[in-house]
UniProtKB/Swiss-Prot annotation:
Phylogenetic classification of the source organism: Eukaryota, Metazoa, Chordata, Craniata, Vertebrata
InterPro entries in the cross-refs: Ribosomal_bS6, Ribosomal_bS6_sf, Transl_elong_EF1B/ribsomal_bS6
SUPFAM superfamilies, sorted: Ribosomal protein S6 (SSF54995)
A GO molecular-function descriptor: structural constituent of ribosome
Keyword presence, Mitochondrion: yes
Principal subcellular localisation of the protein: mitochondrion
Example of a GO biological process term: mitochondrial translation
Family membership noted in the UniProt record: Belongs to the bacterial ribosomal protein bS6 family.
GO cellular component terms attached to this protein's record: mitochondrial inner membrane; mitochondrial small ribosomal subunit
Compartments where found: Mitochondrion
Protein name per its UniProtKB record: Small ribosomal subunit protein bS6m
Keywords recorded for this protein, A-Z: Mitochondrion, Ribonucleoprotein, Ribosomal protein
Species of origin: Bos taurus
Subunit structure: Component of the mitochondrial ribosome small subunit (28S) which comprises a 12S rRNA and about 30 distinct proteins.
């Protein structure tokens, strides 16, 4: 299963309502076969511009980041479910960048200058 990140903006609510909305969201992910790795609260802040969702205009929102594994076939279903949730302003699922170690390219090892000179002298 590939790894995904769900960037989620919830409408500004009190702590119990926010917890209930997050619980609903995570249960929806797990019901569709996802394995949740982590949930990160990025805080509540003013939105960069007024956003409309479910016939309401929002100026503040809570930002959350969910890291999860899921089958590729369920991502569309997850997005459809989240777009219908009245507490969600913006859901956005992106494939997690690969976290492999970056190896330094060995490339072509430069030949020492002396060997290069000797090899050219022998040819003549």
């Amino acid at each position: 299963m590939p790894r995904y990140e769900l960037a989620l903006i919830l409408k500004a609510m009190q702590r119990p309502e926010t917890a209930a909305a997050l619980k609903r969201t995570l249960e929806a992910l797990m019901d569709r076969g996802a394995v949740v790795r982590s949930l990160e609260n990025l805080g509540e802040r003013t939105l960069p511009y007024k956003m409309s969702a479910h016939s309401q205009r929002h100026t503040r929102g809570g930002y959350f980041l969910v890291d999860f594994y899921a089958p590729t076939t369920t991502v569309a279903s997850i997005m459809e479910h989240l777009s219908r949730d009245i507490d969600v302003i913006r859901p956005n699922v992106v494939k997690h960048p690969l976290t492999q170690e970056v190896k330094e390219c060995e490339g072509i090892v430069p030949v020492p200058l002396e060997e290069k000179l000797y090899s050219t002298k022998k040819r003549k």
